[in-house]
UniProtKB/Swiss-Prot annotation:
Composition bias type Polar residues, residue spans: 681-696
Residue ranges of coiled coil: 251-278, 330-394
Annotated region described as Disordered, given as residue ranges: 666-696
A single MF term (Gene Ontology): SNARE binding
Role this protein plays: Involved in biosynthetic vesicle transport to lysosomes. Acts as a cell growth regulator. Also has a crucial role in controlling organ rotation by regulating membrane-localized Notch receptor endocytosis and subsequent degradation. Regulation of organ rotation is not by induction of autophagy.
Protein name, UniProt field: UV radiation resistance-associated gene protein
Residues bearing the modification Phosphoserine: S214, S218, S666, S668, S685
Higher taxonomy: Eukaryota, Metazoa, Ecdysozoa, Arthropoda, Hexapoda
UniProt keyword list: Coiled coil, Growth regulation, Notch signaling pathway, Phosphoprotein, Transport
An annotated GO BP: negative regulation of cell population proliferation
Amino acid sequence: MNLRPRCRKWLPLATQQLRLRNLNRIQGFNIESWPHEKSLELDDPDDVLLYYTLHTDKASEAFYTSEKLPQRHQQQKWAEICTDDEAWRKTNAQCVCVKVWKHYSAERRDGQPPEVEQRHKDVFGRSQLTPSRLPRPPELLFSWGVYFSGLIPLSPLTLSQCGRNCLVFQLNGEQFASPSMISEQALQSQLHLHYQKYAEEEKLEEPQDEGINSPAVSRSSSPVLRMSTMRYAQLKCQRQEIRRSNNLEKLLTLQRLQRLHQQKRRQMAEVCREIARLSVHCVTRNELRLKPRTTSLSGDYSAHQYHSMGRALSVLLAEQQQIAPLTLYNAQQLTRRIEALSSQQRLLKAERETFRQRNERTRQLLKEMREQREAQQWELHSQRHRLEKERLELRTLAPQHLEQRDQKRQIERQVERRMSTLVLELQEIYNIQNVGGRQFSICGIAFPHMEQYTSESRQAANAQLLDNVSPLAVSAALGYVAHLVQMLAIIMDRPLRNRILYEPSKARIVDDIKELTYTTREFPLYTRSILPSQQTKYAIYLLRQNVSQLCFDITGQCDLRNTFGNLLELFSTLRYIERTQRDEVDERDGTAVGAGCGEARLANGLTAPHLSQSHSSVDMNHVPLPTGVNAVKDALLQQLLPPGVSEALAIEGYASTQRICRSVGSYSDGEDEFRPRLEHNYSNSDSNITLQTERS
């Protein structure tokens, strides 16, 4: 493995190390290749080969395998460990795992001579092998985990007294073994030899710390183990057995010179290879015309005139066998060609490797794309199945949807028609007429134009107009208008901007939106004087806002100053809607039934003569209940309108009903309750500004 140590025997010095790089040989003693319970069929010892392997640990691969030798009972001598591995030479490992194997030879398995076995093998081959003729794998006999500092040196006399399956390690010219593999008698003789070598008068006083680098490797109290594993800093030896060594400086110098020598040798080898490579390239075409020389050029002065230094080197290198210049030239051309081809080969290899990696990446990408495509195909397939199911369901539900849509449209038309009918009936209840002079009447009660009534100007026309209007009539008319607006909002299902608190002639309106300086948000829609108060004017202004809101929401246009005009426009629009839908129903149902009757029916089921014969004193409790289509409309109206309202609005079968005004007597609450109580703070609301006449 490495150079042998210069000392003739091993000394237990603290500076002398036991490492894996110092291992030279391993020997085996008393190795048994079969268990104690011998089977009926024993192996022939000549067929069994023993060898060992070295491992860094029990589970690692073997980094060294010895030769296979036939089994010998007493001593198994394997060859020295020889390796050129630099890692082995420089290793600093203090332990190693040794495994001993049993190998079966395949030449003499069936008891025949090797010549006959080889002839049979050549003839028949290995086509018909029985289980008894198949090669058997090697078997592990035992394995050791060896820590070199725990081994003890052995004397030649002690080797014969080793135990079963004992391994002996040769380190630094000395043989070491495990103390557990040595018998007690051998240990006693080993102790005797130790005392003879290191007598008390020949060695120094033993230190208190049991020497340098001498840890307790065993828990045993045996003096033999303690003395065999001890390391000493100094030892007394015979003078004739000691040879003086170099100091540290000289050793470092020798090491440096050895390194320089090795470096020079490597450089010389590189120069020789370069000379051998370039010697052929020195031949030129001019030298080919010269005659080839058969002798050396050394000593010939004229040779330097015709030959270059490269030629001289070529001749010197080829003195043993002269080569013709033409041959050298051909060799030069071939060498150049070979170098060019080698360069091309390297380039092609690099390009092939590049294309191989590119193809590998492309194949990987193609594989991923295929997987993605398959996943997408599967997803699309499942989505298509789901789509087909949904399409079938939609095709099944399409007629129902069309039928429901037609029903919805029909119901919407019926609801609109019913709303229009109810609103027109409200118009019949609260009949609004223009009595001339920009005055209107509701249920026979005259009411002036609201813009003039709420105007702040003191013109003679306004004063005369106000003198002709009674406060009680104004209160009753405002109550009718408030109730009409509230009923319109309920029937048309429209929220009002300003909430109305209806009490026939004492109605009030609430402003919940603006910031007010008044202490209350309820404003009266009645008055007791000819000139209305500020609260009454503001209440009329809020009522006009509600009317304008409804008119704009239904008709799309409104005039805030013309309250009764907005109501009349609203009634005209709803009458047109009701008439149009009635014509559509009549066209769909056919005109034959209408022609047979000779008279057209209105929305409430009555004819025009019935409407002309109506009277305001008709008792609503004695109106006959509707049948047929009207019953369906009433049921639909009860579902659409809020509870409590549908019952009050489902009035059908009468032509005209006039509401008799509730007489307004003395009011219990006066206008003093709604005196403006202005706060002293400032507000951005437009309600605290004095209402003026709205002008276009």
